[in-house]
Amino acid sequence: MEKITGKTQSGFSYSYDQRIMTDWDFITLLGTLMDEGTKETEKITNMQKLLKLILGDEQTNELIEHIRKQNEGYAPIEEVMKELGEITSQKN
């Protein structure tokens, strides 16, 4: 199993199994985030699922805490989406 590791521009370090990028659940969840017809509440729920699918519970919690530290205790959805975009576009 090959791992993708990296660090976002904001300094969050992560590692995940590269196979996740071709997993059915990953593609399905990502598709709902990109679909303009998907309700915003569903997109947020699916983004949470996608983060946990990629990073697992521990790294997801670490990411949210990382974002909170940079935003006076808040984790703005825009920042979470930005980090998720960087993580999923990373190639080893």
Residue ranges and their predicted role:
Residues 20-92:
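Short, surface-exposed, charged amphipathic helix/loop patches that serve as local interaction elements
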Residues 13-14, 21:
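Short, isolated positions in well-ordered beta-strands
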Residues 1-12:
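Short acidic, Pro/Gly- and aromatic-enriched capping/linker segments at domain boundaries
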